[in-house]
Design a protein with these regions (language model features):
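Glycine-rich FAD pyrophosphate-binding loop
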Residues: 26-51
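N-terminal FAD cofactor-binding segment of flavoenzymes
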Residues: 47-88
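Conserved N-terminal helical subregion
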Residues: 78-179
Length: 185
């Protein structure tokens, strides 16, 4: 029979955003749950998915503070020297060049380009055995909802979780967000 588990924060999705949030809560007294349909082995060694993430200098600092930056293979960090932003058929575009300074320090790059799976792997390595963090791997969210008192999540296994806060970090096509009626423009 399913039983209730109370948490302070439930994070739905173990991608870069969900894992980074979990890592940022390390060292607190908060009881955190993280739910993801992938297996523990897949989270530990995610396969390449063809996505590359452009990181700012601030994102690099955050990953450094988490201890995750050094876990990214050095040969897999690529430097961005410039960028161009276009919007469909619009004749307008934005150009960004390497600034002289970034975050108050001399800069030799606009930012960094790293494969999504390397970011996931590096941040996962920092949260894998984190205290006060419970993993629900190979699980999907069946339903999610909220009352003024708390949020509740039911997993496909039938297990029921409650928390003061549920974070929908389950992709830009978040089914959690859709179930909660949160629009995206």
């Amino acid at each position: 029979m399913a039983h209730s588990n109370a948490y302070d924060v439930i994070i739905i999705g173990a991608g870069p955003a969900g894992l980074s949030l979990a890592r940022s809560l390390a060292g607190t007294t908060l009881k955190v749950a993280i739910i993801d349909p992938a297996s523990e082995q897949t989270l530990k060694n995610p396969p390449p998915d063809g996505r590359e993430i452009a990181l700012t200098h601030y994102s690099k600092e955050l990953l450094q503070e988490m201890g995750a930056w050094d876990a990214v293979p050095e040969g897999e960090i690529f430097f961005l020297r410039s960028a161009k932003v276009v919007d469909g058929t619009s004749p307008f575009e934005l150009h960004f060049e390497t600034p002289d300074k970034a975050r108050g320090k001399p800069a030799d790059t606009l930012g960094y380009l790293i494969s999504n799976h390397h970011i996931r792997q590096s941040v996962y390595s920092q949260v894998e055995h984190q205290a006060n963090l419970t993993w629900f791997t190979e699980q999907k969210v069946q339903t999610v909802g909220a009352t003024p008192e708390q949020a509740h999540v039911v997993l496909t296994s039938g297990e029921k979780l409650t928390a003061a806060l549920v974070v929908a970090a389950d992709s830009r096509f978040s089914t959690t967000r859709q179930q909660m009626g949160i629009p995206v423009d």
